[in-house]
Amino acid sequence: MSPASSWKRKRPSSSSAQASKKRRVYRPAVSRSLARREPLQVQDFVWDTDVAFNRGGGCYLLTSYARGSAENQRKTAETITYKVAVNLGCAISGTMQQYCISSRPVCWIVYDAAPTGSAVTPKDIFGYPEGLVNWPTTWKVARAVSHRFIVKRRWVFTMESNGSRFDRDYTNLPAAIPQSLPVLNKFAKQLGVRTEWKNAEGGDFGDIKSGALYLVMAPANGAVFVARGNVRVYFKSVGNQ
């Protein structure tokens, strides 16, 4: 009979055990819903004519999605706005070109948790006193409506005039070039604004039940201006139809 050492099962060597462990590959399961994620919808607001921002500023609705089947329309009674791209060229108004002035206009993206169905003004949001109407860099959301309005983004830019007009000949009268035509290129992401809609087909102030988003701009130091360009909003229709 062979010795006991010849018929006992031998333990695998450490090198073979390590090789078997290396061969084990674990792959995490990927949800089908994640693999087939739908692209975001896009709503474009094109300002191809002058949009004036006068004393006290202006407020424009960004979550303006009428009901329908197009890419820029909501398909359900609930939407989520994820991103906003602001691409605007601003120009100091002709009436202000005769003055030598430097100003700091402000642009905001503001969330409205409980819209009333009517258009909103910067005064409704910030509640500034009359003495600060030309100083938007000092504006804060009014305490009485702080539960309703939330500033998501805030950008300050520079606008200037050197007292010269565009229609004059300055061949022998050199003048310093001011920042009278500033460009506002901003991109806001991770907004996550959820909007609930009433049982209506439109996409205006009166069609929103809760969760609106506004673009607000205001001139500073009395230097009113106009703007042209494009504001693009990225959103998704969610929930039941």
From Swiss-Prot:
Location(s), subcellular: Virion; Host nucleus
InterPro entries noted in UniProt: Gemcoat_MSV (IPR000143), GV_A/BR1_coat (IPR000263), Viral_coat (IPR029053)
GO molecular-function terms, A-Z: DNA binding; structural molecule activity
Signal peptide: none
GO BP term, example: symbiont entry into host cell
Name of the protein: Capsid protein
Alphabetized UniProt keyword annotations: Capsid protein, DNA-binding, Host nucleus, T=1 icosahedral capsid protein, Viral penetration into host nucleus, Virion, Virus entry into host cell
Chain positions covered by the region annotation Disordered: 1-30
Summary of subunit composition and partner proteins: Homomultimer. Interacts with the movement protein. Binds to single-stranded and double-stranded viral DNA.
Top-level taxon of the source organism: Viruses
Family: Belongs to the geminiviridae capsid protein family.
Function: Encapsidates the viral genome into characteristic twinned ('geminate') particles. Binds the genomic viral ssDNA and shuttles it into and out of the cell nucleus. Plays a role in protection of the genome from degradation, virus acquisition and transmission by insect vectors, infectivity, and systemic movement. The CP of monopartite geminiviruses is absolutely essential for virus movement.
GO CC, alphabetical: host cell; host cell nucleus; T=1 icosahedral viral capsid
Main location, first listed in the record: virion
Residue span of motif Bipartite nuclear localization signal: 1-26
Gene3D superfamilies xrefs: 2.60.120.20
